[in-house]
Amino acid sequence: MAYELFYWPTIQGRGEFVRLALEEAGVPYVDVAREPGGMGRMMAAMDGPDHPSFAPPFLKAGELLVGQTANILLFLGQRHGLAPDDEQGRLWVNQIQLTIADLVAEAHDTHHPIATSLYYEDQRPEAKRRAADFIETRIPKFFDWFEGILGRPEPKDYLLGERVTYADLSLFQLVAGLRYAFPQALARIDAGYPLLSALHDRVAQRPRIAAYLASKRRLPFNEEGIFRHYDELDQVAHPGAGHGGG
């Protein structure tokens, strides 16, 4: 059985976190909206009477329909060895994923700080203020936490040690997205987080992920998705920011 992933066809967005898990698991899936007639199918599925999703992404597995990125990953992680078998471990990985989702939402709000219904050009002054605070205070706050997990009780390859989880894949995507959106700022901030940077590189080198990144299935970052690059928002981090935790 091939999974059916429903997400917008031209952006990585939140659907990319699901794609990375499916690719690492090596399971067949169809990116429905990228297929002929797929957008119509996706919109129809969103209007379905049973368990409708508020927005993409959502995943169809047989008769089962699962929405919300972290919820989908919780489901896939248990099925395909991308999460621990015990309840405490599963909840811990889900907790990390939800924290990643918080930072992803804040990254989006740097370019749409007032309203998603407005164009970026309609809120540029506010976006500059939001991005400056995001770079100076918010990224380091979150990165401190991730670095601390990777460093306790001693430095490790992945969040749980030697075993990769969907949260590791999502951290790779988070770092890659922030590097795209804020290359100057991240070049400085990254230096303070060697374990997080190493995890990004380690995930990128995993055979299935490396093959995916080199394929046409991997959509490029662009200015329609969550992580968008605008030169005026890519401000150099404050000298006090970017110190590693742990």
What do these predicted ranges mean?
Residues 88, 95-205, 244:
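GST-like fold's C-terminal all-alpha helical module
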Residues 77, 174-175, 213:
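Active-site-flanking alpha-helical
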Residues 194-246:
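Long hydrophobic alpha-helical segments typical of transmembrane helices together
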Residues 4-6, 186-187, 211:
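Short, contiguous strand/loop micro-motifs
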Residues 1-130, 230-246:
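GST-like domain detector, emphasizing the conserved glutathione-binding G-site
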Residues 8, 166, 216:
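Short, solvent-exposed turn/loop segments enriched in Gly/Ser/Thr/Pro and often Arg
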